[in-house]
Amino acid sequence: LLKVRDVADFGCGPGWYTYLLYKQGYKVNGYDGNPHVKEMSSLLFNDGFYCQYADFTLPISVKEPFELILCLEVGEHIPQIYEDVFIQNLVNNSKKYILLSWAIPNQKGWGHVNCHTNEYVIERMRKYGYHYNLSTSAILRKAASLFWFKDTIMFFERH
């Protein structure tokens, strides 16, 4: 779908998606809110690859923005009071694309404190200059193997 060279995964967990992209030759960085993510990912992959800690409730600035920010099922874990900072972290560190999923109301899961409808998230991203790409989102939703992504994957492009 896209020809990007560099990707950041915000909320990468132990780094599975990040590592897969790394092995495919992408320049990729993974960031997670778990303060032990570096040790966890270093042990898991055991080849020098690791992810980094980031507190998404505080402003984050990377050296150079990434072409694509991947952020899957993270926003619902961020208290609403920090939602603006969280979204700003996505848009400020992206050159062009954001692939985002955000748990919808009543979606099962642990630690969900800030679920939103797709429409709400699309409008929030629009205010930051990101356009919802319906056709790319539909392709990704159809291809998703995890059922919740079929309702929550949203692909955004900077205007």
Residue ranges and their predicted role:
Residues L1-K3:
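Glycine-rich helix-loop-beta junction characteristic of Rossmann-like nucleotide cofactor-binding loops
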Residues Q24:
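Active-site catalytic microenvironments for nucleophilic, acid-base chemistry
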Residues R5-G13:
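Conserved class I S-adenosyl-L-methionine
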Residues K27-D32:
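Conserved SAM-binding motif I beta-strand of class I
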Residues C12-W16, L20, G33-S61, F66-C71, ...:
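S-adenosyl-L-methionine-dependent methyltransferase catalytic module, highlighting the catalytic core
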